[in-house]
Amino acid sequence: MSRYRGPRLKKIRRLGALPGLTRKTPKSGSNQKKKFHSGKKEQYRIRLQEKQKLRFHYGLTERQLLRYVHIAGKAKRSTGQVLLQLLEMRLDNILFRLGMASTIPGARQLVNHRHILVNGRIVDIPSFRCKPRDIITTKDNQRSKRLVQNSIASSDPGKLPKHLTVDTLQYKGLVKKILDRKWVGLKVNELLVVEY
């Protein structure tokens, strides 16, 4: 299954808030059909929704998510926590969390168009796995800096996770350590994703 490129608000209405997918929020009460579901949700449906939240928030294909679950399953620690750490340490997500891009698809485009340097080298792979003490900067040209400047100006500095630091004047970010579970910016039960 390929990456989702359709209407984003439909996914947000169904799955809840997905800050990595879009900044838009659906209007309350507009075109909301009354849904008559039984009181008890089916277990399969709950697990599927949790998996879809991860997929759409991080912009992954089905195969990529399966690969991350497989890697997390081999770890000796909690599989769900390792899965979230792997996803949060992707370069496109780090750019989004630093405020250098307004959404994860926007961050992916910055990386693909070679505007981003990691430790002084151009990286054009959005799934690049960042490590602690990695320094993420923009290319030293006006166009790259202007693209990032717009996002940094509109981002909220209070939402910056504790494992990252950002220097807004030099367009530079630093990964200090691996993320704790409580700083994940998405309400998801990762154990249900692993069970799926």
From Swiss-Prot:
**GO cellular component: a single term:** small ribosomal subunit
- Please report the organism this UniProt entry assigns to the protein: Setaria viridis (Green bristlegrass)
Q: Which InterPro entries match?
A: Ribosomal_uS4 (IPR022801), Ribosomal_uS4_bac-type (IPR005709), Ribosomal_uS4_CS (IPR018079), Ribosomal_uS4_N (IPR001912), S4_RNA-bd (IPR002942), S4_RNA-bd_sf (IPR036986)
Gene Ontology biological-process entries: ribosomal small subunit biogenesis; translation
What protein is this chain from?
Small ribosomal subunit protein uS4c
User: Its biological function?
Assistant: One of the primary rRNA binding proteins, it binds directly to 16S rRNA where it nucleates assembly of the body of the 30S subunit. With S5 and S12 plays an important role in translational accuracy.
Q: Where is the S4 RNA-binding domain?
A: 89-150
Assembly information from the UniProt record: Part of the 30S ribosomal subunit. Contacts protein S5. The interaction surface between S4 and S5 is involved in control of translational fidelity.
List the Pfam families hit by this protein, alphabetically. Answer: Ribosomal_S4, S4
Keywords, A to Z, come to: Chloroplast, Plastid, Ribonucleoprotein, Ribosomal protein, RNA-binding, rRNA-binding
- Chain intervals for the UniProt region annotation (Disordered): 15-43
The record's subcellular location field reads: Plastid, Chloroplast
Q: Which GO terms describe its molecular function?
A: rRNA binding; structural constituent of ribosome
Protein family membership: Belongs to the universal ribosomal protein uS4 family.
- Domain of life of the organism encoding this protein: Eukaryota
**Major localization listed first in the record, in broad terms:** plastid
Gene3D superfamilies for this protein? Ribosomal Protein S4 Delta 41, Chain A, domain 1, RNA-binding S4 domain
